[in-house]
From Swiss-Prot:
NAD-binding protein involved in the addition of a carboxymethylaminomethyl (cmnm) group at the wobble position (U34) of certain tRNAs, forming tRNA-cmnm(5)s(2)U34. This is tRNA uridine 5-carboxymethylaminomethyl modification enzyme MnmG. FAD binds at G13, G14, G15, H16, A17, G18. GO terms for biological process: tRNA methylation; tRNA wobble uridine modification. One of its GO terms (cellular component) is cytosol. GO terms for molecular function: flavin adenine dinucleotide binding. Disulfide bonds: none annotated. Keywords: Cytoplasm, FAD, Flavoprotein, NAD, tRNA processing. InterPro entries: FAD/NAD-bd_sf, GIDA_C_N, MnmG, MnmG-rel, MnmG-rel_CS, MnmG_C, MnmG_C_subdom, MnmG_C_subdom_sf. NAD(+) binds at residues 274-288. It holds the Pfam family GIDA_C_1st. SMART domains: GIDA_assoc_3 (SM01228). Gene3D superfamilies: FAD/NAD(P)-binding domain (3.50.50.60), GidA associated domain, C-terminal subdomain (1.10.150.570), tRNA uridine 5-carboxymethylaminomethyl modification enzyme MnmG/GidA (1.10.10.1800).
Amino acid sequence: MLYPKEFDVIVVGGGHAGTEAALAAARMGCQTLLLSHNIETLGQMSCNPSIGGIGKGHLVKEVDAMGGAMAAATDEAGIQFRILNSSKGPAVRATRAQADRVLYRKAIRTRLENQPNLMLFQQAVDDLMVEGDRVVGARTQVGIDFRARAVVLTAGTFLDGKIHVGLDNYTGGRAGDPAAVSLSARLKELKLPQGRLKTGTPPRIDGRTIDFSVMEEQPGDLDPVPVFSFLGRPEQHPQQLPCWITHTNSRTHDVIRGGLDRSPMYTGVIEGVGPRYCPSIEDKIHRFASKESHQIFLEPEGLTTNEFYPNGISTSLPFDVQLELVHSIRGLENAHILRPGYAIEYDYFDPRGLKSSLESKAIEGLFFAGQINGTTGYEEAAAQGLLAGINAGCYVRERDAWTPRRDQAYLGVLVDDLITRGVTEPYRMFTSRAEFRLSLREDNADMRLTEIGRELGVVDDVRWDAFNRKRDAVSRETERLKSTWVNPTLLPEADAVPLLGKGIEREYSLADLLRRPEVRYEALVALQDGRFAPETPLADDTMLAEQIREQIEIGIKYHGYIARQAAEVDKLEANESTKLPPNFDYTEVRGLGFEVSQKLNQHRPETLGQASRISGVTPAAISLLLVHLKKKGMGRAAAQTSATPVAGNGQEAA
């Protein structure tokens, strides 16, 4: 049957990508439908009970800056918060939280059910409705047709998913949930390029059977307790709990080696490639054979359960081997396994078949987000979901898509990596992937993205007002520090030495003094009983005031480095803004070479910058392409822009 109401946007899947996509489209005013096989598992944390980390926390902050749900839900569900790399520079500091699974799911469900313009419906999707080269809706397993102008597909690991425990396997999207077999078959009929990937999860342990007395306690940060959302407050956090650390040992490693003959990974049963940066314990023992032990973090799953997640021993070994493996670890000698670990293979679709908006190049109005694009991790999925939801809304409203640049957001780095380089293994975000990471910090995600989010319609009045107060205060106080001058008379040696280590010999601005590594803003404005403090407080709200102080201090201390990075961005901007014709035949470019023209014809980059990052496309090839475009007058940007070739792989254009 045809459902009587037509929607603007349909989102298929209710995981981290799907929920952010649905919320974003609805915030833009689009009539949105979220279809899930089970609305009880919306926002489910299928693997580890944590959010954030290096690179990942940056993505969560960016999602939050644009009104997304993940950070706020984590503040309500987080049972431990830590700032990683706190002793290092601000570019690589990252927030990480342990979350209560039940509270997190509840926080997401509450937002979904109370979001205007958003409706939920429980049914598995078996088919996409496609007319010509355009998607027009989705069909459920009982034959209900829902029509929409745009569809966002966020199927996670469910597409033809196969779960492995030892040499036994069965179809499933995750433990306890069915696989999306029919939908996977339908997508293959559409001739979209696809492959198989694999991920895994460890056995879960009953905390009542763990001997914590022989383990190292790992508490969270308590003074102060961090928050994830820019609007978050520590008072929102539930009770805080510690994690615990133990290690594998030589006996553990012997058990694992003895079970490799029944490992689906080492007997060829699993064909999909697993995540490099979250390897199974089998992989660790095999790849790092000389390492005597590996760290294991025992992470609580929540406040109302005894279940623990042993982070570090993801495995698909047979259950009897898993049991012996767990019992070989100190503190787990008598542990009871509540759920076996397993690996899951699933279909993904080559993200090089997507535009930078995450819309399919082959099927108009169809957007992909999350693990279906070859990524791994809740945070990467949520960020893609936000972008796909926004651009589905832009598509419906006939507005230009929003495509964040690499210098603008980690989300821009993520999407650009996916669509230009593709994936051969599950992709996860690290700060090292960003060339401009000094400008892409957690602390300034709102300064980079909230105004854009407001223009797109995804940032509400509460966030916008808080952001404006912060931005105005940062600007006002930074200018005051630059224009307030002190000399040896105003700042005598007795006052200067505790702050600077020596007296000042000439006139300095307060900004000059703050630029010194050892000087903190709080100490500077506290000099001489607050003589150099602003006339009014930075903000009435203590959390907002702390954010303002942080922005002021980082902005002044790192001004020179940030300015140099901005100059590098300007040099590359010409390439990024030079559009390439969508149906251009690259074999027409003389001297380009067969391999390069073949790759460009295959991947269809949207800009010269994207073309430069495709494997095998050299700076010489980019120069030839630019000359050809100018000569033919193809595209206003190409005709008017003097683009700068960027570094390639050193090969010549043949």
